[in-house]
Amino acid sequence: SLYAPSAVVLSIGKGDASGPVTVLRATTLSCAPVPGGTHPAPEAACAELKAGFAGGGFGGLLASPDPDRACPQHFDPVTVTLDGVWEGARTSWQHTFSNACVMGTTLDGGEAF
């Protein structure tokens, strides 16, 4: 094979990563050799993951929340996960947000999740 495989499952779930998380949505995404899977925007999502991958994790996907967008202060946790193979190596990444609004501002309207 001439390329390192990149194929992941992306999910959004209700709950905190320290407890039970109920999966609300999950998609598959393959980025090599060509973008595909069940993800609705595979090309954009692959580009976003490639740009957000650093130091063995995907923390680069997290932006500073938009200071002009106010989110309610209620705690209704949402957890995003990424599991699979990225550039030929097994990977697993997750992040919990205090609520869906905070998730939206921190992921900055990205395509991956």
Curated annotation (Swiss-Prot):
The keyword Disulfide bond applies. Its main location: secreted. InterPro entries: Prot_inh_I16_SSI, Prot_inh_SSI_I16_CS, Subtilisin_inhibitor, Subtilisin_inhibitor-like_sf. Keywords: Disulfide bond, Protease inhibitor, Secreted, Serine protease inhibitor. It comes from the Bacteria. Coiled coil: none annotated. The record marks 73-74 as: Reactive bond. Pfam families: SSI. Disulfide bonds join 31-46, 71-101. It is found in: Secreted. The keyword Secreted applies. HAMAP family: SSI. Homodimer. Inhibitor of subtilisin BPN'. Belongs to the protease inhibitor I16 (SSI) family. This is Subtilisin inhibitor-like protein 15. It comes from Streptomyces bikiniensis. The lineage of its organism: Bacteria, Bacillati, Actinomycetota, Actinomycetes, Kitasatosporales.
